[in-house]
Amino acid sequence: MDTDFEPLAPSLENIIDQETLKWVFVGGKGGVGKTTCSCSLAVQLAKVRESVLIISTDPAHNISDAFDQKFTKVPTKVNGFNNLFAMEIDPNVGLNELPDEYFEGENSAMKLSKGVFQEIIGALPGIDEAMSYAEVMKLVKAMNFSVVVFDTAPTGHTLRLLSFPQVVEKGLGKLLMLKMKLAPFISQMGSLFGMQDFNADTLTGKLEEMLTIIRQVNEQFRNPDQTTFVCVCIAEFLSLYETERLVQELTKCGIDTHNIIVNQLLFRREGQAPCAMCSARYKVQGKYLDQIADLYEDFYVVKLPLLDKEVRGVENVKKFSEYLIKPYCPNGTNETQEQDK
């Protein structure tokens, strides 16, 4: 490590202070506490932003458990906040799970097009999931939140989400090639139902509309002024390996990432002798913290404690969120506590 390099603050205050940020992703290996961290970050952002939305794209939907409040596909205000909203979506479901109003248009053709649309795109691998995501993003953009926090699914799902624009573009190309072959059949079906304005252009127009949305969002995702990705891990080999893979993939995708949260750490307390198990775990964690310091010297690295109780409920999330800004100290002061090497 370069001894002349001044370590960055062990805090996510850089995210809170970046007023241009529009999209914040929080992700990592399963079981490292991503949801607690994403909810805590959303709470801190709600202090300085006009309106904040946290979206769970993890099928487990743990933000309902974290805030101890049931959330749905519709943005719902978090209890105790006027400007913090939450919603849960499943990126693995397709268009059949979306509300009918997503397909409403000025003419009756669009009301019929949902079912036909599903049948046509169903044969295109991966596009159903991508289109569902596009419709959700369309809804989110229309609501115009100041900042959106994504509590993402485990790493593999997250990387697939970032590849959606390419999936849709590939699918669009296939669909456009089929357009001429399908056009007579679709026109006949429209005539059968008495809707002359229902044709191939209606269907491809819907797909192109969503592709435009995905391209716009994708462009914003690759703008470091508007988007950043926070990696969450624990001080263990597999988690650190997964984090490095995630950082490399994000870099390859052009997604900014310069913050890492190391969660579930043991801290020594003055005047208390640790048990043999805690001492052993403390030593292992110290080894991987050294590796993190070497690998990510140009990252903001936040160290969060393993607590003796669950972080559940709004008040507990609020308290825990303070550790993202002010480093945790087991002895009750605000000074940064480093693990013994």
From Swiss-Prot:
One of its GO terms (biological process) is tail-anchored membrane protein insertion into ER membrane. This is ATPase ASNA1 homolog. Its EC number is 3.6.-.-. It comes from Aedes aegypti (Yellowfever mosquito). The active site is at 58. Its main location: cytoplasm. It is found in: Cytoplasm; Endoplasmic reticulum. Belongs to the arsA ATPase family.
